[in-house]
Amino acid sequence: MVEENETGTPGTSRTVTFHDGRKLTDAEHFVFFKVKEVIADKVAEAEILESIRKRSECKPTDEQFISDIINELFYSGEPPKGRKSERFIGPLFDPEKASTASGPMDCTDVVSYDSTHPNISEISKKEEVEMQSAIQQSLASSASQNISRPTMLMSNLEDMVRNPNFSTGLYNSGNTCWLNCLSQVLYSIPKFRSILYHCAPLSWHEQPITNVKIENQQHAELLMLFRGLFAELQFSEMKYIEVGPLINMVDKLSKSSKGPSTIGTQQDATEMLTLIFDWLQRAFDAALHAQLNPEFSNVSDEENLVISDSTTTAPNSDIIGAPPGYNAANLSLPSSSHVDPKSTLNPMYVNEKEPSSTPTSLFGTRSKTIEVNESMDTEAATSSNLPGNSVENHPNPAAPEVDDNKKAFCDKLKESFNNIFSSVCYTESVAEDGTVSVKSNVRNCPQFFQLQVTYGNLHDALEAATFDHGLGNTASHVRNLYDPLPAVIFFGLSRFSFNSNIESKLHDKFTFPKIIFMDRYLKCNKEQLVQLRSHRELCRDSLSEVRAKLSGLRRYPQGNGEVRLEDSFQTVWQAVSNFREFVTFYLKVSQKTFFSREDAHENTAFVGPLTPSTYQSSSDNCSSKFVKDGGKLFPTFTEGFFPGKAAFIETLQNMLEALKTEERDCLAEEARLQEVIDQTYEVPELQQHKYELHAIIVHSGEANRGHYWTYKLKKSIDGLEEWEKLNDQNADRVDWPKVESDSFGTGSRDAPSAYMLMYVRSDAEWLVSADKLTALEAFETIPPDLQEKVLQKRDEFKEKLQRFRENKEFNYQQFSVDSPTVQSTEETPSSFSWYRDELEDIDIGDENANPTKNDYLLNARLDSYSVPIAPDVETSEMKRMVSQMWNQITKIAPRKYTDSQDLLDSNLRSVMEGESGGINFINSRLGYDIHELRSDADNDVEGVYNAFINEYLGLVKDLHELQNSKFVVFVGFQLQRIHVPVLRYLLVRAMAVSELGIISQRANNELSGMSSNSHDKGTAMLQIALLLSHFFELGVMSAWGCRSSLENIHVILNDFKKKNSRGSEQIEVTYCAMIGARNARICNGLLREMAYFLESYSIFFVSQKHIEACTVFSTITMIKLIMQHMASKTLQLIDMEFHLSKNERRVRFEDIIREVVSSVCIIHHWSKSYSKEFQNEINLKELMGLLHLKVEFMVSLTSFEVADPKYECLQAFKAMVVNTVMDLERASNELDYDVLDGAVELRELKKYFKELQLTDVKVNNIITSYDPIIESLVKI
């Protein structure tokens, strides 16, 4: 027996011990009661604990661990007295089935206590409740110690708050865009989600689900997951949610049907829709069965413990009775019925009995054709036909009485389901003599039409799918008619083809209207349709003849080519009538160019037309440059040469007019016939069943890769049409032209195109009435379990958001500026932080990227939505930092940029320049120079514009040097927390500021549109771009300063040793090395001060050790040069002054001393927090100790006259040793800002650093060289 000891301390959990005094750990608590919950008192508690503890090397909360314990307790040795030996197999304990029943076990999920459970005795109920409470408290207290798992939440939770005017998005966890789209499309059918909400019985709310057949258990779990997902989509306050459990269940179902894994792989959306719908339909049947048969259970043991896997006789069936079979007449919702295998129409409706090797998927074939026929689809279905039930060979006892209201409720659900999706297709064969024979009747659920995009438009493709003009060599044809059609119709657009067994995607343009009438496909209109279709076929035959005539007139054979017959007659008429000769003479007269032609031309024999080679051959000769170009001399036909010329010309004119008239008549007849064909069904009688386009799934990519997103119709309260783009996490408002351009396709491989369409019957108000409820009214209509789940999720998010806001407010108070922020009285628009989630790794080349990746780059134009503004505190902080950095940049390079925006645009132009720049990328994509791109070449303009935004970064991401030379590349890969919309802004602005003709114009239009749509006219985005460009410029400047310093140190340590140089040259080079080091220190220090704002420390081009090295070596070298001048009897300190050769500024001795003092203070400051981590680093503490010792010795033993400038230098050195207070350093413009490309700067810096090997040894050598100089000073 278990004892409980309360500590008595408020808020602490109880400890649970056995009589032997051994306390149970939290994990042991959890496992103990998991096991005890199942086996109750059939095994002694001590035996349970012993079995748990002897497996302590295993993970104690793993499901396999618990399963092993239970199996061991029931299989090891003889069972205890009074306990039967039983085998436990079920979803909870069978490893193969455990994962299908629930997700991975979580220590925080304790199974709730059920007081009605038959295994809980009345004596132990109170104790059990208290024990469960103790476990829950213990686990809750230890939950905080669990390792946190990655989350889909953004680092800035403000970005997760959903705008109530937009739909909830779905998180893309990796190639799940297809499931996101299907979920959004199914969710957009209000009545369907209502059916899912209410069809599930209460018994399904607990795991594992037992009130269902074993073979349908996973289907039931799928339905429950869709219920939860739809409820979250409808009521969540988060911008997007995840579908993790749902994709796992779909994967299990796919693999159980011998299909491929769906996790992490792209799937064919249309194929997966049919499969998911089949699974949901099975679950719906099972749900209604459970509603009407609440006693049904797949558990066959008398104590509800043992789940039998027998396929013969169920144990104890005489006690609990065999579960009743499904009532096929009342509950079946068939997905398909038998179809004559000879029919070639509508392969989607044919249930092939044998696996087919023909691929049916855009993304590949499944290993086996999945049967969708159910044995309960017909009245003849009996329980003996249903596999997996161990008791179906026994007569079914009478089912318990069910309330009439429950029966009516289930009937209503079934009726609504059928009205939404179910239809019956009647396939008829019409012989040549008009005899009609019915081939088959097929029930389709859902009604899914597979259309070939090669027909170009929806109605032609639909007619081809439903009407066949002949089978084999017979003259009969087959037609499909429907009665009825459901409220929702799906169209799949077949966009795959095979060429040499290689699957490829068809990018053909395919148009479809927003409204269609389906009356022409209904069985009730059969008689009228037969007449209209017959008339239409006659018109089509006539149209075929007319087009054949037009083809003969316009494509008349000539040699190896074709010519227009009218043009040929026109040419002959002009030649015979000397038309060209007259034109030539007229032009010469009109230009006052008179010359006489020889009469011989009139008698020139006509020997045939002059071919191009005849008169071009001489011009091709090398001497043609000396021969004047005489133009063309056309042959002349005279009456003498051509008797009857006048009559022939008249005949030609008549024939030419006849040809023109015939062509005009053919064109008019073609237009008339086409209009008749198009208007055949446009009669009021065939416009009763109106369907409206409701959703589109669009695909971009190729057959084996790409990305899906959804367009969904939303109607405002006043009935206005609005379209919403649901691209994984993102929901944006778009207009119909945008939907049309993305859906119809253009034939280009780069253009997206529609892949699936969903139409909804316009008069089906009952279908969408749920969307007309207020949020509160809708919430009250969903079942209590979903209400609880929604409220729980909402409370969790609100709590996280509140904590985030409190932390964020605290952080802003720490870094807020002193100047007050003016608060606007207007409504504050939505704001955003431009930081991206740290857990999101940007992968520009991925085509299944999150909206923060390339998908957002390609599709979310900045002018397509209102870009939120940055919070006032962020904007003020950014402006302050930009101003501070701009001041430092202008001190170093005062004339390089006119203002901050010029700095930004200059960096953006550099992105487009160079061998690996954007201009070369665009030229390579176009195949010709960008400046030759015409403004009317819409496809090229659109393609290359999007390609640059989408692919350029992915192309150069592996060129690591470019990450520090191209500004936008640096932002994209070094500052990985920057949101992708900022990257798009930078790429678009880069095209705008470059001279790229129509491309620049297009980029400027997008930026202008963004400014118009933004509440702050794009100020926030510009401010972010300015800040990033200044960060980049400071990074390049720090690399430049460090490189120039090391370059001068290289000259000091190497070149000056090889040649006799003047002292002034050494001083100038050393001074320049010090200035370079100072600028590097200032730029790098300023970046470090501001790194907190980016929450990133990847913005530095150079490391601290590089800056320390160039500062130390330049400083100690300059000290040595000063000492040499002080110890010299001939040299004076004024001799150290020099003119900077680059800017002709004279550097005075005082400037040099001041620079040395400042650098020594910096080194002293570094040495205070110095800890040597690498062997080759300079030991700053030892350096400062040696330097102070040398200088103090020199100062103490040396004296000069007060009037001597060397005395002032000595006092400066003395002050440097005594006073180590670091003064504020200022950047210097004494050096020419001859900055190289960022990558080149770093390459040169690393080269010099490696060559110089600036280590303690070289430092000691320079410091040791002070000794003879100090001895000379002492002697003086």
Curated annotation (Swiss-Prot):
InterPro entries: Papain-like_cys_pep_sf (IPR038765), Peptidase_C19 (IPR050164), Peptidase_C19_UCH (IPR001394), USP_CS (IPR018200), USP_dom (IPR028889)
Gene Ontology molecular-function annotations: cysteine-type deubiquitinase activity
CDD domains, alphabetized: Peptidase_C19I (cd02665)
One GO cellular component term noted in the UniProt record for this chain: nucleus
Organism superkingdom: Eukaryota
Keywords per UniProt: Hydrolase, Protease, Thiol protease, Ubl conjugation pathway
GO biological-process terms attached to the record: protein deubiquitination; proteolysis; regulation of protein stability
Disulphide bond pairs: none
Domain USP: 168-762
Record-annotated active site: 177 (nucleophile), 707 (proton acceptor)
Catalytic reactions of this protein: Thiol-dependent hydrolysis of ester, thioester, amide, peptide and isopeptide bonds formed by the C-terminal Gly of ubiquitin (a 76-residue protein attached to proteins as an intracellular targeting signal)
Ranges of compositional bias, category Polar residues: 380-393
Protein EC: 3.4.19.12
Enzymatic class: hydrolase
Positions of region (Disordered): 375-402
Protein family per UniProt: Belongs to the peptidase C19 family.
Name listed for the protein in its UniProt record: Probable ubiquitin carboxyl-terminal hydrolase K02C4.3
